């Protein structure tokens, strides 16, 4: 596959546009630095003066330099001990914004009949709110343990497992396809970090958004300038 720039900042490989959006039935999004502008764990750490320490681990994990993602997340969450729910709400209200084109792309996909899945190594405190605002159909993410309004530095196990890592993102994509009665090739997967690669490999169309180099190299589409809605340039009107 030879990457081709079909427009400034829009690189494709492995297919020839235009595609038909209605040929796809599901679109799966990562959240942090994909649908939204922040890495939530880094911003939460800022509330206890540990952003630099946590962000360094996050950056290494997203580049694929950390082999045990679950352990890296446990380490980061442990450093969040003492953050209050009030501070978490402030981060959501004051720092979190949708990336350019996010709402437009989700709306276009829903209008074309696609279901929308949000799979995140982040936290339900944010994914639940993002899903509600954008009308997202399915979510999977991690639950921070809270006691008396304060983070304990631990996560809560869920019926599906302990932590939503790359393998869990892939599993949730495949489970959602099975639920909808579709093939994974009828799914689009959008992400920016190494933990998005397992689900991107399963999808019929993989999309890297302002992504790490390892992700850009493997994706069918790499959006390197502009917003998420640039993906729509590849589809017939």
Curated annotation (Swiss-Prot):
CDD domains: HAD_PSP (cd07500). Its cofactor is Mg(2+). GO terms for biological process: L-serine biosynthetic process. Its EC number is 3.1.3.3. It catalyses: O-phospho-L-serine + H2O = L-serine + phosphate; O-phospho-D-serine + H2O = D-serine + phosphate. Pfam families: Hydrolase. GO terms for cellular component: cytoplasm. It is an enzyme of class 3 (hydrolase). Pathway: Amino-acid biosynthesis; L-serine biosynthesis; L-serine from 3-phospho-D-glycerate: step 3/3. The active site is at residues 30, 32. Signal peptide: none annotated. It comes from the Bacteria. Mg(2+) binds at residues 30, 32, 192. Keywords: Amino-acid biosynthesis, Hydrolase, Magnesium, Metal-binding, Serine biosynthesis. Coiled coil: none annotated. Catalyzes the dephosphorylation of phosphoserine (P-Ser) in vitro. Also catalyzes the dephosphorylation of phosphothreonine (P-Thr) in vitro. This is Phosphoserine phosphatase. It comes from Albidiferax ferrireducens (strain ATCC BAA-621 / DSM 15236 / T118).
């Amino acid at each position: 596959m030879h990457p081709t720039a079909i427009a400034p900042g829009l690189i494709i490989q492995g297919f020839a546009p235009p595609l038909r959006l209605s040929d796809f039935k599901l679109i799966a999004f990562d959240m942090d630095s994909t649908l939204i502008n922040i890495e939530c764990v880094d911003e939460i750490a800022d509330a206890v003066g540990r952003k630099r320490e946590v962000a360094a681990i996050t950056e290494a994990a997203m580049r694929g330099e950390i082999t045990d993602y679950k352990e890296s997340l446990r380490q980061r969450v442990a450093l969040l001990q003492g953050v209050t729910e009030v501070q978490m709400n402030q981060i959501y209200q004051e720092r979190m914004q949708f990336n350019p084109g996010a709402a437009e792309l989700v709306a276009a996909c829903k209008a074309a009949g696609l279901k929308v899945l949000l799979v995140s190594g982040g936290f339900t405190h944010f994914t639940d709110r993002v899903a509600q605002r954008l009308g997202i159909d399915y979510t999977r993410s991690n639950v921070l343990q809270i006691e008396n309004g304060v983070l304990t530095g631990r996560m809560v196990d869920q019926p599906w497992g302990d932590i939503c890592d790359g393998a869990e993102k892939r599993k949730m994509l495949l489970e959602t396809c099975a639920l909808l009665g579709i093939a994974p090739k009828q799914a689009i997967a959008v992400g920016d970090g190494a933990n998005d690669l397992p689900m991107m490999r399963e999808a019929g169309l993989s999309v890297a958004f302002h992504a790490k180099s390892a992700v850009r190299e493997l994706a069918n589409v790499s959006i390197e300038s502009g917003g998420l809605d640039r993906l729509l340039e590849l589809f017939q009107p």
